[in-house]
Amino acid sequence: MHVEGVRNWLLKVGLQTTDLECGSHWPSHQESAHTMIADGVFHQAEHNNCSGKHAGFLTLALQLGYPHKNYIQPDHPVQLRVKEVLEKSCDVELSKNEPAIDGCSVPTWAMPLENIAIGMARWGTRSKLDPEFCKASEIISKAMVLHPHLVAGQGRCCTRVLSHFKGKVLVK
C-alpha cells in the first residue's frame, strides 16, 4: 500500500520515483521485505519508510515554484521553509545550528525537548499556533485519523494507537 501510494502520488504531480532523494532500504515491515527477497525484487527509493515524506517535499517544491532537484539540501527553499515552520511552531531559533542528516537524507534540527513539546502541543491543539499553520494542522490531523496505516505502517505502534483512539489521540 505504501509503495503504490507513493508511486501514484508522484505520478499525480508529474514526477517519478527516480525523483526521490531519500535513498532506498528494505521495508521495515518484515513480511514485505521477505516477500520481496523471495520474489527477487530489490528495494528502491519508494520502499524507503520516508518516501511519503519525500513525496511531500517534492510536491511542496512544485506548488511553490521551486526546483525539485536537490530538495534535501539544507539551503534548498523547501528545507528552509521546513526550518521556518519548525522555528515558528516550536518557538526556537535554529539558524545558529548546523543540521544533522537523518537516515533518509534530510536536514534534521536539534532543539531542546521543551521546544519539541511546545510544537507538538501547538500542532495538536492549534492553540497558540501561527494562524497560517492552523488549516494545515487540521488537514494533517484528519488525514492521520482517517488513514492511520499511512502514518507508520501495518502493525506499528503509531498505527495501532491512531486506529484505537479514532481522533482522541494523535501520535507519530
Q: Positions of the model-derived regions?
A:
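Charged, low-complexity surface segments at secondary-structure and domain boundaries
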Residues: 67-72, 125-131
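Short helix-capping and hinge/turn segments at secondary-structure transitions, especially at repeat
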Residues: 91-92, 118-129, 145-153
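Conserved SxxK-family serine transpeptidase/carboxypeptidase catalytic domain
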Residues: 131-172
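Active-site-proximal alpha-helical segments within enzyme catalytic domains
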Residues: 58, 107-126, 136-141
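Solvent-exposed, flexible loop/coil residues
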Residues: 24, 41, 62, 103-105, ...
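Active-site-adjacent helix/loop patches that line small-molecule binding or acyl-intermediate pockets
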Residues: 1-98, 103-104
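Amphipathic alpha-helical surface "interface" segments used
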Residues: 31, 106, 163-165
